[in-house]
Structure formats: structure tokens, C-alpha cells
Amino acid sequence: MSLELVEGPTVIVGAPGSGKSTVGALLAERLGVAFRDVDAVIVERSGRSISEIFTDDGEPAFRALEEEITAELLPLPGVLSLGGGAILSATTRAALRGHRVFWLKVGLAQSVKRVGLDTARPLLLGNVRGQLLKLLNERAELYREVATEVIDTDHNTAAEVVDMIMKARVAQH
């Protein structure tokens, strides 16, 4: 594989249940590069779950931490998976310009199926289906804004999504 194909980070964005962590890890393995997940780094460094941070500190504090860690990880090579709401930050959206950003697009039915109705995700408490629909609608334009490529994940396995990203990476060069 050409070194040109793996230089600079490949960034994965998408809503809850789009497969960011699974696809990101598989893609990094396929490319032989490091995989970093912003949410996992937040949990590791804080020693608390995302839900605990939301509950104890509030969403604005979590978003500030997410923005800070995204900015720290974005220059590193490999594959970087952002949290579903990272694109809410104008600073993060601006920082993504010039990077290869893949939006893993997921529909409501698949998102609910993958996330589950009994979820510990802080923004999905209560009516999971309704909250997911709201998130998908509110964030679609922001995902579209940052994406260099849109990958539909609804009817594809994680391995098939990785294949589509690999083909798109070659086409982008």
C-alpha cells in the first residue's frame, strides 16, 4: 500500500449507531495505522463515563472537553473517530477542513436497532426513537458540511463500509 494513502488522519463522523467505533477500528487495522476514538480518550482521561460527565458537569463542559481532545488528536496520523456531537462545535468543524472526513450516514431504523432502546447514552434518555430522530435531523447538515465523502451504513456490514471507505480514499487521490 502506498504511503501516500495513509498520510494524515482519516476522520470518521456520524450519529449514534452509525458504526464509527467499529468501522474506525477495522479501517485502522486494514491500513496498519493507529485508531483513536475521542469518546474513549475522554473516558480514559477523566476516569468517568460519558453519562457521568454529562450528569455531573453538564453538556457544555463535555462539549468543551470533546473539542479540546479533538483538537489534540486531529493532527495525529491514523484513523480518528469523533463523538456524534463533535460537529456541533464551529471550532471543530473549521479544524476539519482539509482533512479526509467520512460521514457514516445512518437512518433512524438502523440507528435505533444498533443503539438499542435501553441505552445509557446521555442524550438519548427517555424516548430513544424520538431523541435519535431529533439528533439525525438537527445534525445532518453539519455532517454534510464537514464530510468529504458520505457513506451509507444502513444496508452494509462494517467490513463493507470499510471497503467503501478504502475505495473512496483511493478516488480522493
Task: Show where each model-derived region lies.
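P-loop (Walker A) phosphate-binding loop of NTP-binding proteins
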Residues: A15
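Conserved lysine of the Walker
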Residues: K20
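Hydrophobic positions on the alpha1 helix immediately C-terminal to the Walker A/P-loop
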Residues: V23
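Conserved phosphate-donor/acceptor-positioning beta-strand/loop module used by diverse small-molecule
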Residues: L96-D118
